[in-house]
A protein has these predicted regions:
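Short, internal strand/loop/helix patches
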Residues: 105-146
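Bacterial Sec-dependent N-terminal signal peptides
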Residues: 1-21
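Thiol-/selenol-based redox modules, centered on thioredoxin-like
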Residues: 139-200
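Short, thiol/selenol-centered motifs that function as redox-active sites or metal-ligating centers
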Residues: 58-67, 137, 193-196
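N-terminal "domain-start" segment that seeds a small globular fold
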Residues: 18-44
Length: 200
């Protein structure tokens, strides 16, 4: 009986830790996912990067749609300034056909995406990182051969109106890192649609 209780507690702790995902200071796992051009993309492809902006997003979510231009803007600003942006679509396409790979290709072309748009078809990356919403940002900084999480959360403080944004969390974090300072706001609440997890 005691062994069973211990096993149940250990399992609960393990599941809780897994569900929690990454927090600032954690080392982020590398991944290799398929891009809309058919090529595989991983963090280690960016050998000269200072860090990477990983954004979990999708096609159908109204919040993601509102942020598409801002995500593209981040990529244009930072792709060649040391912090390239990678977008990852983790949604179950059975529940939302609009997030299918072919639809991702169309969306990227229509919107002129200047960043890789990857499909996390097993949802393993989203689960490992602890992504729960679309969009959900994980800002990574390269330290040696590893990538360390420096910021987790929202892109900025105004989902509805880009012109009314007061704090650009991702840009602020990158500016602080570039200045050799710690990130003053390292965690915010991601506002968006819940990720559509595959049903068992």
């Amino acid at each position: 009986m005691k062994k069973l209780v211990v096993l149940m507690i250990a399992t609960f702790i393990g599941v809780s830790a897994f569900a929690q995902g990454y927090k600032p200071g954690d080392k982020a796992m590398d991944f290799k996912l398929k891009n809309i051009d058919g090529k595989m993309v991983s963090l280690t492809d960016y050998k000269d990067a200072k860090g990477i902006i990983v954004v979990f997003t999708c096609n159908h979510c109204p919040f993601s749609i509102k942020y598409e231009d801002r995500i593209n803007g981040l990529a244009k600003k930072y792709n060649n300034a040391g912090y390239p942006l990678i977008a990852v679509n983790p949604n179950d396409t059975i529940q939302y056909a609009d997030d299918a790979y072919s639809k991702m290709q169309v969306r990227a072309k229509d919107k002129g995406f200047v960043f890789p748009y990857l499909v996390d078809d097993t949802q393993a990356v989203a689960k490992a990182y602890g992504a729960t919403k679309t969009p959900h940002v994980f800002l990574l900084q390269k330290e040696g051969k590893e990538f360390v999480v420096k910021y987790v959360g929202a892109i900025d403080d105004n989902t509805d109106d880009a012109s009314a944004v007061k704090v650009k969390y991702v840009e602020q974090a990158i500016d602080e890192l570039n200045a050799g300072k710690p990130v003053s706001v390292s965690t915010t609440k991601a506002i968006g649609c819940g990720i559509k997890w595959k049903k068992a």
